[in-house]
């Protein structure tokens, strides 16, 4: 159900991800575990459906918060639909780098970033290319730089660096890696995700998306305090950002993960200017042609 419950403005901007081919993994059960039809509906329509079947949406939402809640069939509803689909198959790739640890080589840290974006939209007038400079060339650059730095030191645990495919198509690359890892997933002690490192400038804080998800935040807070900085929990948890990036594929398997994001409290400009910068990106660049090299390189030049 959309609207404010999952951030209606994000749903509108994400429509670029809904056009064209819709991708999925080639599953062993040939998709039989999936619903016949999956869709989103507005809150207004949801209320109408619940009322029509004799239920109250708000009341059931409260009841569903109890862990003993059981799903049930809403009788008296039917849907007639005709969908014509052409199915084709192709391969894409996750890239994995590996540095073996010294004393605990069978334990792993994993640093991840998705390398894909949205491609080209020939229906647009003018610029048609979705460059994805911030989302997520910056994240890939961060993982590459971390790999370069880790290559200069010896670590007790092994370190995995991965650039993941098809994040924008439903976190498919990370889902595949989490389901079929070339390493023992139970021995991954920490996973770090870099998804969109905005060039907003130096900050006094660091945002943690999904605050409270793992004890890795405690280690981050300890290091930030050494720099005179602090953790700023996600100010918009209702948007569900924690569930919309690659780390969640590993979190669902029990891997402790940390998804940190740009801080809001800018050294020059404070929190107000920080939120202005994020508003500019989210509303005028995110999943659009303006998320381009000029945006990221201009900020880098200022540094």
Task: Locate each region found by the language model.
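Second-shell loop/turn segments in exported
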Residues: 34-37, 83-86, 125-136, 204-210, ...
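Metal-dependent peptidase/peptidase-like ectodomains
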Residues: 26-57, 104, 155, 164-269, ...
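Active-site loops and adjacent core secondary-structure elements that bind or stabilize anionic groups
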Residues: 10-11
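Short acidic/His/Gly/Ser-rich catalytic and metal-binding motifs that mark active-site loops
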Residues: 117-123, 200-202, 270
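Soluble metallo-hydrolase cores and metallopeptidase-like ectodomains found primarily
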Residues: 28-132, 148, 156
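Active-site alpha-helical elements of protease catalytic centers
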Residues: 132-146
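Acidic, Ser/Thr-rich peripheral helices and adjacent loops at domain boundaries
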Residues: 15-28
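Single conserved hydrophobic/aromatic residue that forms the stacking wall/gate
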Residues: 1-7, 295, 299-303
């Amino acid at each position: 159900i959309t609207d404010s419950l999952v951030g209606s403005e994000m749903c509108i901007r994400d429509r670029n991800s809904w056009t064209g081919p819709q991708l999925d993994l080639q599953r062993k059960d040939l998709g039989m575990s999936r619903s016949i039809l999956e869709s989103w509906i507005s809150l207004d329509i949801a209320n109408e459906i619940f009322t029509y079947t004799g239920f109250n949406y708000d009341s059931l939402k409260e009841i569903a918060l109890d862990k003993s809640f059981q799903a049930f069939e809403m009788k008296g509803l039917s849907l007639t639909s005709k969908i014509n689909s052409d199915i084709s198959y192709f391969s894409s790739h996750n890239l994995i780098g590996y540095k073996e640890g010294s004393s605990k080589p069978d334990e792993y840290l994993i640093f991840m970033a998705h390398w894909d974006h949205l491609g080209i939209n020939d229906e647009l007038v003018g610029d048609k290319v979705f460059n994805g400079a911030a989302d997520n060339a910056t994240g890939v650059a961060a993982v590459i730089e971390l790999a370069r730095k880790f290559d200069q030191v010896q670590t007790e645990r092994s370190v995995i660096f991965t650039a993941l495919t098809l994040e924008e198509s439903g976190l498919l690359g990370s889902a595949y890696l989490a389901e079929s890892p070339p390493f023992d997933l139970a021995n991954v002690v920490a996973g770090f995700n870099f998804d969109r490192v905005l060039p907003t400038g130096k900050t006094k804080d660091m945002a943690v998306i999904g605050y409270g998800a793992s004890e890795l935040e405690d280690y981050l807070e300890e290091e930030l305090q050494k720099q005179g900085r602090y953790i700023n929990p996600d100010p918009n948890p209702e948007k569900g950002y924690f569930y919309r990036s690659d780390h969640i594929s590993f979190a669902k398997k029990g891997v402790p993960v940390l998804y940190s994001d740009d801080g809001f409290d800018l050294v020059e400009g404070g929190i107000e200017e920080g939120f202005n910068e994020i508003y500019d990106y989210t509303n005028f660049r995110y999943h659009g042609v303006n998320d381009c090299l000029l945006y990221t390189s201009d900020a880098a030049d200022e540094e």
